[in-house]
Amino acid sequence: MPDASLFNGTSFITLFAPNISLFQASIDFYTDRLGFAIKETSNQKLVWLQLEEDSNNVSIQLLLDPEHAASVSQIDQNIRNLTRSLYRKDWRSIQSNIAFKSSSLSKLVKLLKDGGHPVQQSPNEISPFEVYTLDPLGSLIGFSGFKNPFAVNERSLLPKVSEEKAYRTEDDSEKLFTPIRKTIGVMTSGGDSPGMNPFVRAVVRAGIYKGCKVFCIHEGYEGLVRGGEKYIKETQWHDVRGWLVEGGTNIGTARCKEFRERSGRLKACKNMIDMGIDALIVCGGDGSLTGADRFRSEWPSLIEELLQTERISQQQFETYQNLNICGAVGSIDNDMSSTDATIGAFSSLDRICRAIDYIDATANSHSRAFIVEVMGRHCGWLGLLAGLATSADYILIPEKPASSREWQDQMCDIVSKHRARGKRKTIVIVAEGAISNDLSPISCDQVKDVLVNRLGLDTRVTTLGHVQRGGTAVAFDRIYATLQGVEAVNAVLECNADTPSPMIAIKEDQITRVPLVDAVELTQQVAKSIESRNFKRAISLRDSEFVEHMKNFISTNSADHVPPSLPLEKRKKVAIINVGAPAGGMNSAVYSMATYCMSRGHVPYAIHNGFSGLARHESVRSINWLDIEGWGSLGGSEIGTNRTLPNDADIGMIAYFFEKYGFDGLILVGGFEAFISLHQLERARINYPSLRIPLVLIPATISNNVPGTEYSLGSDTCLNSFMEYCDVIKQSAAATRNRVFVVEVQGGNSGYIATHAQLACGAQISYVPEEGISLAQLEMDINSLKESFANDQGKTKSGRLILKSENASKVLTTEVISTIIDDEASGRFDSKTAIPGHVQQGGIPSPMDRVRASRFAIRAVSFIEKHSDKCQAFKNSISFRQTDEITSTAVVLGIHKSQLRFTPIRQLYDFESDVPRRMRKNIFWSNVREISDMLSGRTSL
């Protein structure tokens, strides 16, 4: 048995068991597995256990005491939670532990694993310093080979070998090292998409971090079938450096007819066994994932056939009994059910929107119509969101077909009305899978002929084609592809033979696992539903926001051109104001709010230049449709914005103008200043009846620091602008060799941008206000840089990036940190600073910010419609009381796990905000920081 002694010299420890079964199981665990002896049994409910060879007389007092013990359900739940996080989290960060010393960790690990006990080894299974396990009561028990638990420079636990024997044959190396946890193969298949490289990078580094070998399988299933070191290559940590910024897939992709046959899959099976691969991660479309799952289901029969034909040994047959498969969806079409977004979809949408923004200029110059064809096969997601983001005149998508006569009449009616009101350009977006309701395809040439023959428009056709696939991934795809890659590694490590093959999905902005077979089946049902003309079911199988986006496009597209949908008595006067610093999506929110109001019959007003503009200059203008045409694609704030609060501007005058214009509702678009403004307006209701109207805040700030939401307009635009800036800076650092750039990030006291930018840019280090900068951490980071550059000799892409939030430290400024690094480097590398400043606000808003601005604005108007009559009841009340019913009409509209929700400002201000620091109390991006540090190889104190 392994000898052990308690680190801190404690004389005894007491453990409580809730029932006789766990009491006896605990005795067996400590005696049979850990080498304890029963020292004393004074009664049937008390046992003293002591180590047989312990000079310190350390004992464990085990009591059968249901009153003081945790319940059986609590113990079971705790063990389940810890076991579930075995490969995800360090147990020491979750639960306190008892630490012992052991002179034979390998023997201890074998004893524990033979007994079926979960074992976590640190830092990895190849050369562990510490081992942790769980006893039957859920207690966390630790063992170390060090006399000092905090030592890290003790002798190596591996056998010493002479230099000439450092390189051994495969058989010899197996004797020197403990077995690798898993050998993972990762491949990309089907059509390429931006974000595949970040996904592969994450799989490689997460796998290595967790003690696995990782092989990249080149050329998709073709490479798997051909096999050999040319196609199946072991990949090291540094091999994937720089992959974040590269588009497409660096390991190649190809369609493989041979893999569709059993003979091809048999070859693939043999090739994987030859390389020792027992887990496969596939990034591709539904066809690729279907093939992977079929491969897994046939695996037992494939290895049986290989054994019978003597192509593998009996030992190999026993070793590779099971194959774990995990899929991730790489597709620009966003056509997979069970996930809200596929890897590459938002990057493709960005290409489309940029192209249409460029086309807008020439279309406007010549007063032309442009037909733009986008990809998508059976899915109209790209066409729909591109139409919404660019304010296209008309879209044709597979999910909403109409008869040939109907779509032609409808399109011509809308386009002619837009032209009649002074619009010079026409944009029609056609998805490549667009069909009429008789399933006949609709081509761009057909659409062109209709516009030319019926309206006499000078019309051009633009087919974007493979431009939509090209280029580097946007921030969203880099971040979520990386998170999915890490989760895919966790999945193959946690799955067993009975676990259905998982697919990594995004649901409600969270990375989740869904059964791969079910997701593929639902996806294929979309095509079947369209073929059977069941178009309602086809739409229902899309992501949760698809139908809402469709309705929003129809509503905003018909603004001011068709009779309003509300009766006269239901129509309102709705005002909108921008407050705080500019943010991408502000103009999109104003445009969508105004056009939706027009379609409903409301009168939209814009308050220019914030509350100071209203109080000092009565800057109120009703909004005309033609005046805001094209605003959805503009950055900044066309109606002006500043940081002046209502109390500072003169809240009495503000209330007066609200009364004068008879506003029935107000929408505020802005950041923390808008949050405080909403609070002040809500508080002032008791004195000013004109403020007793529905008040809605749409968060819009690059800092993403508004309480009540996990997403603010402008944050995605900021991330993309900052990411592009960092890509250029990192390129400069790499070209110069041995250079570090310390880049300052905006965001106030919020580390949201710095944290996500670290993941998107591949920065080695980020400092954020939530953590601050300690001298110990800075010293460790500098030592890490020294080691990193020392290991880079002869390697390319050797530049480094450090991100520092502007408020991470008042003393350790960007310049100071750079100077310290420069001094400590002693000429081995140098350090420079880069401060992008207000460049981070971005120019043209990202498609995500545009689309979400539209969704936010329309939901805000709907909220005002719903609560306006309720407010009217107490608007002129003399005895005004702030009841829950009243306070619920002044709200922040936010996203929580992809769901839009309205939260009263009073609740957020009183309980969920840190007003002095201009921050929310709940920090929801901590897990992203952990993953960022893991993938950059950084150790955080």
From Swiss-Prot:
Protein name per Swiss-Prot or TrEMBL: ATP-dependent 6-phosphofructokinase subunit beta
Subunit composition and interactions: Heterododecamer of 4 alpha, 4 beta and 4 gamma chains. The gamma chain bridges the N-terminal halves of the alpha and beta subunits.
EC number: 2.7.1.11
Residues where beta-D-fructose 2,6-bisphosphate 2 binds: 643, 701-705, 746-748, 806, 838-841, 918
Functional summary from the UniProt entry: Catalyzes the phosphorylation of D-fructose 6-phosphate to fructose 1,6-bisphosphate by ATP, the first committing step of glycolysis.
Pathway info: Carbohydrate degradation; glycolysis; D-glyceraldehyde 3-phosphate and glycerone phosphate from D-glucose: step 3/4
Region (C-terminal regulatory PFK domain 2): 573-941
Residues engaged in binding ATP: G191, R255, C256, G285, D286, G287, S288
Record keyword Cytoplasm present: yes
GO process annotations (BP): canonical glycolysis; fructose 1,6-bisphosphate metabolic process; fructose 6-phosphate metabolic process
Binding residues annotated for beta-D-fructose 6-phosphate 1, in chain numbering: R368, R460
Residues of the active site: D333 (proton acceptor)
N-terminal catalytic PFK domain 1: annotated segments: 2-558
